[in-house]
Amino acid sequence: MALPLWALTFLGLTGLGLSLRSRKPESFRSETELNHLAVDEVTGVVYVGAVNALYQLSADLHVQQHVVTGPFMDNKKCTPPIEASQCHEAVLTDNFNQLLLLDPPGKRLVECGSLFKGICALRAMSNISVRLFYEDGSGEKSFVASNDERVATVGLVTSTRPDGERVLFVGKGNGPHDNGIIVSTRLLDRAEGREAFEAYSDHTTFKAGYLSTNTQQFVAAFEDDFYVFFVFNHQDKHPAKNRTLLARMCKDDPSYYSYVEMDLQCQDPSDPQDSAFGTCLAASVATSGAGRALYAVFSRDGRSTGGPGAGLCVFPLDKVREKIEANRNACYTGAREAGRTIFYKPFHGEIQCGGHLIGASESFPCGSEHLPYPLGSRDGLVATAVLHRGGLNLTAVTVTAENDHTVAFLGTSDGRILKVYLAPDGTSAEYGSIPVDINKKIKQDLALSGNLSSLYAMTQDKVFRLPVQECLSYVTCAQCRDSQDPYCGWCVIEGRCTRKSECSRAEETGHWLWSREKSCVAITDAFPQNMSRRAQGEVRLSVSPLPTLTEDDELLCLFGDSPPHPARVEDDTVICNSPSSIPSTPPGQDHVDVSIQLLLKSGSVFLTSHQYPFYDCREAMSLVENLPCISCASNRWTCQWDLQYYECREASPNPEEGIIRAHMEDNCPQFLAPDPLVIPMNHETEVTFQGKNLETVKVSSLYVGSELLNFEETVTMHESDTFSFRTPKLSHDGNETLPLHLYVKSFGKNIDSKLQVTLYNCSFGRSDCSLCLAADPAYRCVWCRGQNRCVYEALCSNVTSECPPPVITRIQPETGPLGGGILVTIHGSNLGVKADDVKKITVAGQNCAFEPRGYSVSTRIVCAIEASEMPFTGGIEVDVNGKLGHSPPHVQFTYQQPQPLSVEPRQGPQAGGTTLTINGTHLDTGSKEDVRVTLNDVPCEVTKFGAQLQCVTGQQLAPGQVTLEIYYGGSRVPSPGISFTYCENPMIRAFEPLRSFVSGGRSINVTGQGFSLIQKFAMVVIAEPLRSWRRRRREAGALERVTVEGMEYVFYNDTKVVFLSPAVPEEPEAYNLTVLIRMDGHCAPLRTEAGVFEYVADPTFENFTGGVKKQVNKLIHARGTNLNKAMTLEEAEAFVGAERCIMKTLTETDLYCEPPEVQPPPKRRQKRDTAHNLPEFIVKFGSREWVLGRVEYDTRASDVPLSLILPLVMVPMVFIIVVSIYCYWRKSQQAEREYEKIKSQLEGLEESVRDRCKKEFTDLMIEMEDQTNDVHEAGIPTLDYKTYTDRVFFLPSKDGDKDVMITGKLDIPESRRPIVEQALYQFSNLLNSKSFLINFIHTLENQREFSARAKVYFASLLTVALHGKLEYYTDIMRTLFLELMEQYVVAKNPKLMLRRSETVVERMLSNWMSICLYQYLKDSAGEPLYKLFKAIKHQVEKGPVDAVQKKAKYTLNDTGLLGDDVEYAPLTVSVIVQDEGIDAIPVKVLNCDTISQVKEKIIDQVYRTQPCSCWPKPDSVVLEWRPGSTAQILSDLDLTSQREGRWKRINTLMHYNVRDGATLILSKVGVSQQPEDSQQDLPGERHALLEEENRVWHLVRPTDEVDEGKSKRGSMKEKERTKAITEIYLTRLLSVKGTLQQFVDNFFQSVLAPGHAVPPAVKYFFDFLDEQAEKHDIRDEDTIHIWKTNSLPLRFWVNILKNPHFIFDVHVHEVVDASLSVIAQTFMDACTRTEHKLSRDSPSNKLLYAKEISTYKKMVEDYYKGIRQMVQVSDQDMNTHLAEISRAHTDSLNTLVALHQLYQYTQKYYDEIINALEEDPAAQKMQLAFRLQQIAAALENKVTDL
């Protein structure tokens, strides 16, 4: 049966969750060590300071700019500028970035390095390669940062006052060659003769007063209100300890009167003795629900406490402020003597407190010269750590708030990010840990992105971008709840884990369940609690918490696999009808549990579920053997027993006779109390039993029996319900006892029987007399002397009560030490019935103390031997109840003295683990358990016992010689002179290589010292699953902790061992791998300063095409990926069959080796298949082998002698080759000459117009500067999102601008509106069913009359309708796309895919790209496109434009080129706009312009700062010229227009004789005088009665039509003349092209340059295409290139380029459109891989851009290549991006109108859609056809109403 929709959704979400988690974090790697990181909160740009480098990265960590900052010649002692003559000690020195700060108001970046005494530079934030200020010759006043990289520098850029200048506050320690300044305030702008970075005033610095250097290490600087704060560590000398201090000063305090500092202490709650952490490592200030606070992480080095530790403390800033003010007040007004113990003067010594008036601190909030300053206090703030960790250090902290919940992200010393929730009550909870860069410390700069969605972390050489939450990866409410992520909660109505802001109804009660409140929607109770499977009724479910639901939420009940049905809701109770069908009851049960599922949104969202039992009374009677009535009446259901029919059935509400109701099982007829309870085997026994409640039982015919032993006997009835029967002789050999449950039948029906007896066998397991007499007396077993065995007493006539004497068969051990004290075990028979029977034991003449704990009846006695004075061998004697037993001669015990003589080896590691071999005599005395070996009281575990002893040493606290001691049975035996020496553990100094493939087998050379001490080495890998992967693999199979031991190694000497790396699990990224070298008992991590040993995934190889490689040259080539990631050329091996293939080259993707000259035999020869007798090609990397196919040598031989073959074959072949080469050379030379000739001509033409291009380009740039200023003033007129999508989606539709989707009008009578809208919303829900929508689309596309235009329109309507759920829209598009791709691949023409938009999905892709790239157009690519459009428009309008023929002098299009030379002159006219009070505006026009053209240019100039849609139309204004006192209205056509026969010429300014400098007045009219589209039907004033054939012209009058009688030859000449004219004017095309070239290049670079940020949608879709190509095994790069080209450049960019009005509020004239078409065609040519050879017949546009096309093609190739190399965009990131677009813009679209339009298609093809839905099983299950019918019923009058 098909899965329900919610289950499919769940599976999809599960896949999404896995893909979300499987992605690796985005990262950037630096070649040098990283120092600092800063993030621009507005642009998202990331700035990174490193050693010798600065980086400007995009938000996704792609490099935008890279600046080299070192190394340079310097010495810490020298003063810059560094000159060799002045600084002889200067050497090439690295530049460590000491300070990296942003100044967003100034759009600049502050960076200071360690070179040149720590001077700083200002750089542009937009481009860090632009240095705004740098001065290295100002001397000490410009030394800002420390020039010692070990001394930290912190800073803060702020303003001294709200409107004050920007300054830099700096805090740094005092390095050995620093200037001693600790705290300073620096200028950022020149002021009052001071340069940037000089001190703000002469007093704004504090210098160190200490003699020692580097006593301060600054941690952080921050601001709060009008104060600046510093956090730093200070090393006190007396006593020597570290203090963490917080310093504060006023921003606007040029003299530092306000400086005050105090201690900060962070208490460790886990260590009351050493209760405070010592050093602050990182600090961050954040505002959370509890207010603004300082969050600081502290560490403890662990030297005194046995290990490192760290804690997080919180210091609320209001408490900081209170404490500082209290300290100030105490110093100002307190006693002087008392203040000396608390207060001090930082940097200078003692301070004089006291003597000031009360209130001085309030009167002088920023201190004063007469008050003590600077002020330090040892009385500071103390906080208890809200989080503490042992074993590691916390190295970074940043804090944020989500819905007033405080979240801290903490970096650790082992390369992880801890996610911690800080509760309002002061407690904390770590809810996640992200392994960022294992065993690499997280650096202090931990930053959040501006939108708080990402976290940037930095290690030694990498920057990582991590999501702050992964809510969408938790696919169930339980997973969401268990994550405990404060960002996440379960969005009930959407059935997914989201942030609160992403849940549409989060503010409604019960709709967003916060993860930390640990609640999910659950069914807490059901009434009734169970139901008979044969009953019908309602089930009332108590649901908590039940979200508030509306009628539209459609709550459904689903019982098991039954169809869902609507549920009713009453308060917090959901009422469901019982299902019509119930699964069968499982065998052995009386009920079946059926899952009740509550679903929302037509079954697409799972709410909760509950197991509900349906019971079956017919099965209840057979649950207990032989007790049908009791089983029925005693179960937990309401079943009852029918005495008449002997059946179990459901209870009836009415009283009935002959019924035993539920829980009245005592009333059942039954038989019980058998006597006797035990029955001997092989003996007939009389059994009596009782009856009860037998009134309805016919006791006259009763039978008793057992199905197990297959017997049945008649029952005899006695008085008082007593019965009896006689058993036959029963036997069963398998056991001592056998429980029997006897049945009782009456007329074939079972009566309840509790007759349980036990059948027993006396002989079983009782082989001797003692064992027999020890049996349970109830069995009445006796030892029968005559039979010599144990039997039932009635079966024996010769019973004895006494047993024979004991028999001893063997002892263990057979030897013992003279000191005794060991246990001896005596085995035999008749050794007594109980322990008390054993009276005395003698071993070798010595008493042996009985040990009752080891006694076993009759078979075993254990005793402890006593000491013996001398060695002796003797027997064993046992006294059992006065009967003596003696051991036979071969069972003897020997007293002997063990004597150890020597031990090997004599030394081993301190960690232990050495196996010692002890030699001596009689060492095998006793048993292994009796021997104990110690080394200086440290146990040596005995592993081997015999003539030699072996033991494994334990760990010793210190190295040295120790004595070996051996104990036997507690007594020490002498071992004179035997000692063992513990040596220091071996040490690993280096290893190489640093990595291995997961399959292992790589030789790892480990060097160090002390290896000769070791006996056994092993390379051990501990694979600990990462927490995130544990959750990820919960469905696919949990990951377990794995420990792998590699025992293969070669020992060389004391300093070198070579290991073979062991194989580890195949997913190394899923585990935290710890690699150790185990040396006996010592384990050392395989980690040195060079790095940590790591595993990488195995390489992949491509198999040979067809499985066989033809060997035609000397090398075999194999392809793959990651081949050299953990393998070198020297290590790699390859084989051809049984022989080696000599390795020649190994790169990341290629392997070359030289095979044997003669074909070797295969490794595994096949007998029958001759093809398989070819040798295999095998690649071996370490332990793993890859068989890539077989190698076929060319083994053909000829009987013809070689001396004949060479002349006969070679001579003709050489002749043919020579002739062919000559012919080919001639043809190539001819084509090359033609190509070079054309190219030369083109270059010559370009050269001839180059000077003109330069001049015109310069003029254009000057004029475009005004345009640019207008753009900056008014902004680029980008359309709003709705208008943009309307134009992109619907302009191609047949109704154009009048399309109802654009107008947004839906005319519905008010009386019908609620019904219609409700139905449309239901239709929207139906569209959100994937099954319905796919069927809907397939059905429409199968209709013949569903044209390509209709598909385009339908897809656009669908885009608008689903815009609110773009993630779902994308899923639908992907599904349809996979189907489309399958069709093309099956048809073997994949290159044709996406060439047009002939399917719905192709248009959906166009719309999807348009949606996803809108913001990119708006932010990035829009400006160069707009400037290109304006440049073309400006250049076209500089020359004549024929208003009738739409041709221009300056154009890129040869068909739109104005052929004739037209005389014209530029004019500048003054224009006054009437009634607007604007001064006269100069406007440039041409004297050949028509009046309409003049109007357009005037409007363009006057209203240039307004969007085009706000401009007046040319036909709505009147142009008036006032040459003198008179006024003349100018128009295109009037009575003065020039006439020539049938032709009338349009008036121009020249016609009216308007001169340069003339004044024109523009005024508006009420009624349009001329239609707007007059350009198409130019001023046709056709008065049929006066002139039938009036024709108009402007600049060039068309020639009369050629007579029909003209010959074809004449026509050919005309064509040639036209072509000649075009070529003549080609220079003009080149001139325009050269003028516009920069704008064209800028646009191409903005779209195709890899340096620009690529929209995530492009990366996402291109990766999708790559994946599908790989899936379908499409290796042809041309095909993939075509797919990408058709999906983005040709589908989107060409469309936007040809139609700028789609994105901008502009009007595109035909002459501008013609030039745009040429550029668009060039863009299209650049995207094709086909090479176009130029000839004289080539189109002029291809000739125009012949030189540039190769550059553009490379840009496209590089663009595609760059995208492929980008970090993958995960499904989660894409869905988040799409969700943001949905939220931002959906409300502005005409969704309701789109739904109505879509419904028209449903109405048109109603029957076909219904049939399709009814034939689809999934649609049937969800009742989609029925739901559509309901919607159609609601909308049936809609068409007529509309």
From Swiss-Prot:
Q: Which gene encodes it?
A: Plxnb2
Specify the species: Mus musculus (Mouse)
Q: According to its UniProt record, in which tissues is this protein expressed? A: Detected in macrophages from spleen and bone marrow (at protein level). Detected in granule cells in the developing cerebellum, dentate gyrus and olfactory bulb. Expressed in neurons and glia in the developing hippocampus.
Tell me a Gene Ontology molecular-function term this record carries: semaphorin receptor activity
The annotated topology with respect to the bilayer is: Single-pass type I membrane protein
How does the record describe its quaternary structure?
Monomer, and heterodimer with PLXNB1. Interacts with MET, ARHGEF11 and ARHGEF12. May also interact with MST1R.
Q: Read off the lineage from the record.
A: Eukaryota, Metazoa, Chordata, Craniata, Vertebrata
UniProt protein name: Plexin-B2
Q: What happens when the gene is disrupted?
A: Embryonic and perinatal lethality, due to defects in brain and neural tube development. Mice exhibit abnormal cortical layering and defective migration and differentiation of several subtypes of cortical neurons. Cranial neural folds fail to converge in most embryos, leading to an open neural tube and exencephaly. Likewise, mice exhibit defects in the embryonic development of the cerebellum and the olfactory bulb.
What positions are marked as the site Cleavage? R1168, D1169
Keyword Membrane carried by entry: yes
Q: Where are the transmembrane segments?
A: 1202-1222
Q: Start and end of every IPT/TIG domain?
A: 806-895, 898-982, 986-1095
